[in-house]
């Protein structure tokens, strides 16, 4: 990921931040009864915290343990978010000979799944976690050189590498604090950029920490989603500069700040990709992990959200070194070979629901 330039320039250009909660599932085109049942039981939560300082009468403690989100049956953002809407019944795919398709499949760099450097640690804070002060070069909606406070487990650590992402869900589970280039540890930390995203929103829009302009946690493969739990959301995918084309498309609101001279491909930031329903996933000779992701790409698709060395998906860091992740990585070239671009994705036809 080459987001540092894009994020910094985005901050300079936008300067400010800126619909409901964790949706258990969304519209699903499949006939899988589990998905249909989940859709009927979509969750809603209360209003988000909007202040820049978190206060509470509940006691804090320094005895903490960082944990990822506990409600693994839930997915962030509104049920009608593009992340959760599912592949539309009217989706129109670009042909296999279309320049965008051939460019998407042409990378000489081996497709990969990122779980270490440049990945996105996602932490669920509790009321017992201490309040941490975070001083940032820029806080969306606040300004430069600002400090904010919120609850963070003291042992929560940012991803290794130059991006240093760290994302923290508030105890109310209504908001995620997303950070870029986090430094330090304990109760006093710094970061380059911080934005608060409403977990009941679409997950897209200006002010996010990813190159496409929206939330960084949208499309993240969580650790249990490779052990048999169905993936009920679209995936986040990054492409190389040789695959990306300058000029982002909906629902992206931005691209890397150097796009005009670094992008030389055919696929715009924000493009929606999927495996057509006509593809027999069972005939692709995939591992269980690869099949899980293939089904997600066929039921929910993927959004182009960032730049990397080649086609790349993202998982929680806890999967690094696991056999599940190794299996998925081995299947990536097969998966990419089945991806096509949905031509009729727009605000009027989210994920191709209207032909």
State each model region's role.
Residues 65-355:
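Short, surface-exposed polybasic-aromatic patches that bind anionic ligands, especially phosphate groups
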């Amino acid at each position: 990921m080459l987001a540092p330039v894009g994020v910094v320039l985005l901050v300079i250009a936008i300067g400010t931040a800126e619909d409901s909660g964790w949706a258990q599932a969304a519209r699903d085109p499949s006939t899988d009864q589990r998905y249909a049942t989940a859709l009927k039981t979509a969750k809603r939560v209360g209003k988000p915290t909007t202040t820049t300082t978190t206060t509470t009468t509940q006691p804090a403690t320094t005895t903490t343990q960082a944990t990822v989100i506990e409600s693994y049956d839930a997915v962030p953002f509104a049920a009608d978010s593009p992340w959760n809407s599912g592949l539309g019944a009217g989706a129109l795919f670009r042909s296999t000979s279309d320049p965008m398709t051939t460019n998407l499949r042409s990378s000489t760099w081996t497709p990969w799944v990122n779980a270490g450097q440049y990945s996105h640690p996602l932490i669920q804070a509790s009321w017992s976690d201490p309040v941490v002060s975070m001083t940032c070069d820029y806080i969306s909606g606040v300004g430069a050189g600002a400090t904010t406070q919120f609850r963070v487990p003291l042992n929560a650590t940012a991803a290794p590498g130059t991006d240093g992402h760290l994302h923290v869900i508030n105890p109310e589970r209504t908001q995620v604090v997303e950070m870029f280039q986090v430094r330090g540890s304990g109760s006093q930390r710094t970061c380059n950029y911080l934005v608060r995203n409403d977990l009941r929103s679409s997950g897209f829009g200006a002010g996010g920490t990813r190159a496409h302009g929206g939330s960084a946690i949208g499309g993240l493969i969580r650790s249990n989603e490779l052990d048999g739990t169905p993936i009920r959301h679209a995936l986040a995918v990054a492409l190389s500069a040789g695959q990306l084309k300058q000029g982002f498309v909906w629902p992206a609101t931005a691209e890397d700040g150097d796009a005009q001279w670094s992008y030389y491909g055919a696929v715009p930031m924000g493009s929606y990709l999927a495996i057509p329903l006509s593809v027999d996933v069972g005939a692709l000779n995939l591992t269980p992990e690869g099949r899980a992701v293939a089904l997600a790409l066929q039921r929910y698709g993927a959004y182009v959200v960032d730049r990397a060395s080649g086609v790349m998906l993202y998982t929680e860091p806890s999967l690094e070194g696991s056999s599940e992740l190794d299996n998925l990585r081995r299947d990536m070239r097969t998966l990419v070979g089945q991806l096509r671009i949905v031509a009729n994705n727009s605000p009027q036809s989210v994920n191709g629901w209207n032909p």
